[in-house]
Amino acid sequence: ALGGVIHYYTKSPIIKGSEKIKSSFTTNYTSANQGVSNNLVTNYSSENWGSITSLSISKFGDIKMGEKREHGFNSWGLTPLYSENSRYSYYPEASINSDENIQKNTGYSQVDLFQKFLIKLGETNLLNVNIQFSESSDIDRYDQLSITNAGSLKFSEWYYGPQKRFLISPSLRIFPNRKFMKKGAITFGFQKINESRIKRKFNALNRSHQIEDLKVFSLNGDFDTSFNNGHSISYGVESTYNYNYSKAYDQTLEIEGNQVTGLGEKFAIPTRYPSDGSSYSSFASYLNWSWNMSEFFTFNVGARLTFTGLKAS
């Protein structure tokens, strides 16, 4: 088996930049789903601190697949039937798709806000504060809404409710320039994630909701040093704590014509995860030694020790 890490970096503010304020705007359009994405970025740079702000607004329509079907599976990926049901509309029967190449119920929209501050502390130390927020519209599950039962669709509704994510992560970068600690970073992180799964079958008025409220805490310390003879050492510790609270319930739709005019009282159903809450925690430490033996050879050896805990009820 192969292992690896995909490490994403977000843009960072600049201190003492050549321009005090710099902004840019980009927009993208995709014809396959009539999607439009707009992004506005503003940078501010001063003598002792910098800021970068990014706002993205995206809206995507239903995906249209290619019409040339040379793979031999003539009906694969086509959408002959679809559901017009939503939070606020009610249709007792599946609808016929006038263009089967359009994958109905694949469109959604999303807003993303990204803010970073970089603050100089003293002569060498830096404080980086990373703040992110994102929220989506309802996101339909195309695969579930395509399942058939006795010649018709099984589900009239199956979608993720608006997904919300908030993150704040301050990171202190230090440069003590000592023998066993030339530089290091101490990073705290907190995320709050809300998601839900809502579904209802055709010929049924009960709409089920499964709602998750997840909180994630993390604390990392990473340090390294190097020596003149080609040797370098990196070491650190990490602690994480994840807590999820789940709830689930059914509600009966109150309808008038094709409109959902109200919802009945909630009654409990099985939750997706333990209903009294569940948590996962970990603590880990690592040590890595690297030796650049020559221009062509590098020797690495490392060790990591991890403790984990799981609690659910």
Language-model segments: which ranges?
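Face-selective signature of the C-terminal outer-membrane beta-barrel domain
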Residues: 120-134, 162-313
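Exposed loop/turn and edge beta-strand positions of beta-sandwich/beta-sheet ligand-binding modules
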Residues: 2, 19-21, 36, 111, ...
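Solvent-exposed coil/turn segments that connect beta secondary-structure elements
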Residues: 11-13, 30, 58, 240
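Short glycine/serine/proline-enriched coil/turn segments at secondary-structure junctions
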Residues: 15-17, 32-34, 178-180
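N-terminal periplasmic accessory domains that precede
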Residues: 2-26, 38-40
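Transmembrane beta-barrel wall of Gram-negative outer-membrane proteins
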Residues: 33-59, 70-138, 164-166, 173, ...
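Solvent-exposed loop segments that connect transmembrane elements
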Residues: 67-100, 143-157, 200-207, 249-273, ...
